[in-house]
Amino acid sequence: MASMALSLTSSPTYSLSFRSLPSLKPLSKSQPSISLPSLRSNASKSPSLSHKHFLSPPSLLLPHKLKPISASSPTNPPPPPAPVPSPAPVSAPAQVQPWQGASIKPLLASILTGVIIWFIPTPEGVSRNAWQLLAIFLSTIVGIITQPLPLGAVALMGLGASVLTKTLTFSAAFSAFGDPIPWLIALAFFFARGFIKTGLGNRIAYQFVKLFGSSSLGLGYSLVFSEALLAPAIPSVSARAGGIFLPLVKSLCIACGSNVGDGTERKLGAWLMLTCFQTSVISSSMFLTAMAANPLSATLTFNTIGKAIGWMDWAKAAFVPGLVSLIVVPLLLYVVYPPEIKSSPDAPRLAKEKLDKMGPMTKNESIMAVTLLLTVGLWVFGGKLGVDAVTAAILGLSVLLITGVVTWKECLAESVAWDTLTWFAALIAMAGYLNKYGLITWFSENVVKVVGGLGLSWQMSFGVLVLLYFYSHYFFASGAAHIGAMFTAFLSVASALGTPPFLAAIVLSFLSNLMGGLTHYGIGSAPVFYGANYVPLPQWWGYGFLISIVNLIIWLGVGGLWWKAIGLW
């Protein structure tokens, strides 16, 4: 249905009225051209008749010198012929309006998923509300993947279903709209608007192209390692991705002629967005202060095994596998999902010319730059000042609104920001209540029983636990929620099965970041980069799964050897 609607929308419409027909050339020099009122008269035209004869009665087709035979007196002329009514013009048929609603097949797939799970008997130990919410949640996930409607609409329908079935109260269903993370992501899009509108984004982008732009790969690596250097100082991956790198990457894409919606996404933007997202997940796993939920892992580790993970412990253990991942992942994506622009030796020269043409910074560029520095400074030192990331972002946006660098109408026009806020908050709410209703605890306990009863070595048992912990993240829209729900249980089981406790804790801590690369909602940077609309959802999930395998191989393989060398096991 979606493809039919698309074809109806994009195909030109033709009117059958005579005005749309091309004028016909005269058949001879003596005959005038004929403008026909309908397709029917065109088909019945005789080439031997002029236009005047074509519309005359048969008796008038005789030559003028011959009188028509009449029984009446010559003094009584024949009555004039009855006028022949001209054929009525054929009116243009009414245009068929394209279908504006949902794509039927994806919608049915989403509904059917929920209905099937809903009517499966509730397992022992699971409450009915938890099972109903699981059915609605998975139905919503299928809808988000197949997209019968935009993501925000699908998520809103999921919340509506949970309230309608009394699975959640209204306040519970919409509780996550008060969560800071969705708002931080939305605010990042407003910052990006100011970044691009003022031209500051273009200026910085051209500087990057001037320094590293002779190849797309060099440009990508310059962004990757810049983000990794900022990671330990900015403890919010949403803030790093949305407030700093999304505006910069979008400006780079536009500067290189890669835009959304005109078929040029694959020139540079698709590869660059996916690369920056996947490497933001890696850099978040490399430092204790690189992601907001990492200190939670450290706290739960201390509560479970009585030993804390220090900042240097974390950084030393993550350095080698993290560095290898930062090098391998962009290169792998460059091979399997390559940009169309690979080499541009003239790009640095052209970028320099653009910078010369732009001249000195404008007033609005200066305001934008100072505001960005203020916001980043609060992200770095806000913990000591009692200012969290979203409050810092609101303060920065307030400065932009007061100075007129960004207007509120422009913020309202950022439909992607509001759409992302809607679907991300909806998923956070549903995933959070799956945990509150005890479904995640039930799942963890059953995994523990099954793996513990297999009689495997601690290495094999830990490998099974790692895979289950990692890929269960498809059911979470927050790293913190996943850690809070499953970290303690899996760490306890791994330790009981013989895994060195500190090794198990630090590996699960790293995986709590890396698993965010699976989906477009699994970590704070995911909806930021996905919301730029350069990469279609199937590719986002597909390459997310591929990179997850590569990361597991690197972190458990290369990382395992490194951890052996530094004495973790």
Curated annotation (Swiss-Prot):
Location, primary (coarse class): plastid
Tissue specificity comment: Expressed in leaves.
Disulfide-bonded cysteines: none
Keywords: Chloroplast, Membrane, Plastid, Plastid inner membrane, Transit peptide, Transmembrane, Transmembrane helix, Transport
Post-translational modification as stated in the protein's UniProt record: The N-terminus is blocked.
Keyword hit for Amino-acid biosynthesis: no
GO process annotations (BP): alpha-ketoglutarate transport; malate transport
Any GO MF annotation of the entry: alpha-ketoglutarate transmembrane transporter activity
Residues covered by region (Disordered): 23-93
Family the entry assigns: Belongs to the SLC13A/DASS transporter (TC 2.A.47) family. DIT1 subfamily.
NCBIfam families for this protein: dass
Protein name: Dicarboxylate transporter 1, chloroplastic
Name of encoding gene: DIT1
